[in-house]
């Protein structure tokens, strides 16, 4: 366990590959020596472990096990536990089927590429007027547009800030009898996106092909507009310890006791979306779920301020990403910042609670659901963006966009 943790923290090695290598050498130890004693190992044992991996795993996995076996041996040599000579992984890295031009590789590439009809459907939806699109539609089509502009991991979308667009003017070259020269007469505007690379490289500008610039600009503009109110709420919470005066908040003093309807508005529950009966019933459920009194004149904004801040996401003002090696993005800067239930048609948006979509949110909208209803053996009725817009059961994964761009580049 200590070795696995050491390699994960210090060398960023994949835990699964490290464990598979340990298991391979463990098997050889037990077969040859009847016990696990690393001091008895010889070079031939590592050859046998690599051969075992070749027999039990597919070529790409076996290669990585062999690579990890070399790392393990080098580690043992460094600590002087073993006095063996250097060892080379005998397993060759399999040819990249994305590049090789044989029939099998061609079929492999085709299976990895996105359905052309699905891409055209997404393009058609993206081209619609903004007024025709729901926030969920804007999220999906804009995210896909960005993924088609640069071969980035889909999970890195959510590290983007609202000011991710980078523009600069560059001097182009022209032909002359002396070859290509910069004569100062041609200035071209180029556009890039500041992406955050998860593998410890920080933010880096990836320039966009000129044909994609209008699409990227529109996608980012839509996302900025969609995230404007959540980002503003986060900003208000950052700059002051008072109750954040968002759009629904009643214009009353902080210490004035509130009616139930005012409490609901202050906590981001838009009562105007319901009739009187629905507002009464749904409002009670909402308040009870948050341990807020349902009677009139029980609490003021000062009281609600404490309750609201206690419900803020972990690590606020920063978004609590599960990946990204500690990337720091404030909610007030996050391009994909949203409110709770903002994408849910059956529930009202909560305008005082922050939420961030994830890679799963995007994938769920690109492929027919596999989720089952809670407590039942039947699928939920969640529709993909294709189904919502009448394009049938198209299915596509976020990783396929990256394969498409890499295939075009090759």
Describe each PLM feature range.
Residues 183-185, 189-192, 197-247, 252-253, ...:
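Extracellular/surface-associated beta-sandwich interaction domains
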Residues 117-150, 154, 400-402:
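Basic, Lys/Arg- and aromatic-enriched nucleic-acid-binding interface segment
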Residues 1-108, 145, 159, 218, ...:
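Charge-rich, intrinsically disordered N-terminal extensions
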Residues 80-83, 147-179, 410:
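Short, charged phosphate-coordinating catalytic segments
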Residues 47-63, 168-200:
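Long amphipathic alpha-helical scaffold regions
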Residues 32, 128-134, 150, 250-403, ...:
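Short, basic (Lys/Arg/His-rich) helix/loop patches that form interaction surfaces
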């Amino acid at each position: 366990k200590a070795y696995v943790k050491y390699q994960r923290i210090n060398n960023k090695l994949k835990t699964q590959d490290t464990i598979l290598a340990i298991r391979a050498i463990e098997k050889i130890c037990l077969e040859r020596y009847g016990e696990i004693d690393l001091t008895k190992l010889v070079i031939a044992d590592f050859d046998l472990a690599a051969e075992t991996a070749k027999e039990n795993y597919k070529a790409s996995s076996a290669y990585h096990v062999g690579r990890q076996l070399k790392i393990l041996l080098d580690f043992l040599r460094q600590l002087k536990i073993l006095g063996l000579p250097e060892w080379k992984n005998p397993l060759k890295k399999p040819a990249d089927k994305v590049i090789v031009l044989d029939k099998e590789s061609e079929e492999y590439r085709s299976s990895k590429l996105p359905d052309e009809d699905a891409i055209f459907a997404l393009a058609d939806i993206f081209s619609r007027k903004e007024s025709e699109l729901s926030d969920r539609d804007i999220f999906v089509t804009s995210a896909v547009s960005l993924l088609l502009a640069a071969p980035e991991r889909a999970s890195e979308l959510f590290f983007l800030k609202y000011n991710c667009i980078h523009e600069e003017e560059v001097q182009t070259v022209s032909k002359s009898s002396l070859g290509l020269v910069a004569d100062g007469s041609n200035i071209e505007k180029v556009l890039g996106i500041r992406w955050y690379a998860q593998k410890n490289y920080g933010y880096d500008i990836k320039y966009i092909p000129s044909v994609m610039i209008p699409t990227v600009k529109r996608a980012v503009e839509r996302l900025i507009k969609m995230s404007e109110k959540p980002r503003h709420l986060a900003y208000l919470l950052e700059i002051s310890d008072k109750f954040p005066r968002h759009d629904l908040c009643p214009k009353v003093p902080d210490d004035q006791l509130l009616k139930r309807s005012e409490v609901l508005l202050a906590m981001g529950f838009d009562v105007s979306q319901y009739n009187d009966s629905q507002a009464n019933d749904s409002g009670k459920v909402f308040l009870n779920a948050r341990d807020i009194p349902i009677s009139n004149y029980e609490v003021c904004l000062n009281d609600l301020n404490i309750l609201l801040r206690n419900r803020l996401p972990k690590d606020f003002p920063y978004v609590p990403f599960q990946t990204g090696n500690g990337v720091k993005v404030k909610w007030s800067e996050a391009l994909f910042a949203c409110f709770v239930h903002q994408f849910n048609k059956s529930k009202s948006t909560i305008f005082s609670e922050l939420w961030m979509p994830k890679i799963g949110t995007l994938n769920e909208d690109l492929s027919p659901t596999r989720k089952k209803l809670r407590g039942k053996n039947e699928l939920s009725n969640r529709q993909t963006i294709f189904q919502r817009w009448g394009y049938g059961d198209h299915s596509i994964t976020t990783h396929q966009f990256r394969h498409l761009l890499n295939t075009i580049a090759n």
